[in-house]
Amino acid sequence: MKRLFLLRHAKAQPADGGCEDFDRTLMLSGMQDAAAMAHYLRKNEYACEQILCSSSARTTQTAELVLQELESEIDYRENLYLADAAKILAAVRGAPGHVSSLMVVGHNPGLEATAALLAREPVRRKERARHEALEEKFPTCALAILDFDVGRWRDIVQGGGKLVDFVRPKDL
């Protein structure tokens, strides 16, 4: 089994003429949300072996706050900056086979599209509720967790993942 965590960066400073989009840092509320999400992961005993992270300032800060609660290796990747679902999926499929749990820290709309692409049709009521929340909005610092019944990351297919959790900062 492979477990995929898709974490959108936390709330960042507004885009204004002051700095490049890539260099935008987290707002205080974003830092608090990321710390709360990290605590949620630890409290629920979610383990993540490796993190693939967009190299932007806001994703880097989000990942570092999550690392305060998780023991993971982190790999910063420029090609995940504003990546679409195809690029994210390619990165996931290229993950080492020995890694059973992988997190991608990135941006919308790519993360939301990736979650929607990979999640299977809901089977149970709780799973349906998670799908409805995901379809409503994938806000900053939201986390989707998908399980795949495969032995290799490269075998992940569209609609092949069970959406086992979808958490937003307002849920914490």
Please provide the spans of the model-predicted regions:
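Domain-level recognition of soluble alpha/beta enzyme cores
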Residues: 119-164
